[in-house]
Swiss-Prot record:
Keywords: Chromosome partition, Cytoplasm, Cytoskeleton. Disruption phenotype: BacP has nearly wild-type localization, only minor changes in ParA or ParB-parS location, no changes for PadC. In a triple bacpN-bacO-bacP deletion ParA, ParB-parS and PadC are mislocalized, nucleoids are more compact, DNA origin regions are mislocalized, DNA content increases. The triple bacNOP deletion is synthetically lethal with smc or double scpAB deletions. Interacts with BacO and BacP, the 3 proteins colocalize as an extended structure. It comes from Myxococcus xanthus (strain DK1622). This is Bactofilin BacN.
Length: 113
């Protein structure tokens, strides 16, 4: 997928395996395996993902189980259920979201702290 394109995995679709790509991806269905994207991944409220995820940015409205490594940002919205460890420089968890795991934010602190 070329940069700038968005792929959609619809509500009735189940994918088992590895997903890789350079564009954005929206998951409304179910994915099991591993996901590696160069851009933005969105898991919609109907989406269920059981996978380790690597992406630039991740927005979760549905369910995700597995470790997450984002180079930019992870947003866990109020309707989301997430189980797994997160590594990202910025993480947002909205009130109402369910999260079970650990968060590692690789942020450089000033020397005087």
């Amino acid at each position: 997928m070329a940069t700038g394109e968005t792929g959609i995995i619809g509500k009735g679709i189940v994918i088992k395996g590895n997903l890789t790509g350079g564009g954005d991806l929206v998951i409304e269905g179910r994915v099991e395996g591993q996901i590696a994207l160069k851009n933005h991944l969105t898991i919609e409220s109907t989406g269920k993902v059981q996978a380790d995820i690597r992406a630039e940015e991740l927005t979760i409205n549905g369910e995700a189980s597995g470790n997450i490594d984002a180079s930019s940002r992870v947003a866990i919205n109020a309707s989301a259920k997430v189980a797994g460890d997160i590594k990202a420089p910025r993480v947002v968890i909205e009130d109402g979201a369910v999260f079970n795991g650990s968060i590692e934010m690789d942020v450089r602190l000033p020397d005087d702290i």
